[in-house]
Amino acid sequence: EEMIKQWIMENIPDFNTKIHTEEDMKIKVLLPYLRSLGYVDEELRFENGIDVQIGTKKTKVYSDIEVIINGKVEMVIDAKRPRKALAEKDLLQAVSYAKLIDTPQAMYGVVCNGIDCVVTDTYTGRRTVEIPTKPQLLRAIDKAKKPIMKEVDIREVESVLFTLHNSKELYKVIQDSKDV
């Protein structure tokens, strides 16, 4: 059983009736769960925006939660509402954001809906299902070889993130107009 599922069963018995939105997931689940893994509030930053530019087009992309260690963003967590199946593009978006947020890039891009988490090492591409504890994250940072991304790679990641973000915005606009 994954640690987060175990933790939810023990700490949020009414998960299915109480947790509905991305905000619920962030505030009622991920935040206390991160504390249980050893992170302190001073190491967490929320809704931080980065500007992504492709040619003359510009967009702003926000992270849900960033974990900051020694003044550097090392993990970016994207919260999804429960029961929203995690798609490949969600994972790609989290990793792209993690690569652009800091120099050198953040170690991990994470997508989590409480039921499932996918944690991607941004350097190796390796995926796991457990959000690392703080000691695990510190060890990983310690061991990582952290080459700085080349300009050409940064531009490529920017274009991926830009496309993903804007197609999502477009989709949202389409959905919103359907709801009317």
Predicted regions and their residues:
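A short, conserved, highly charged catalytic patch centered on acidic carboxylates
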Residues: 1-108, 116-180
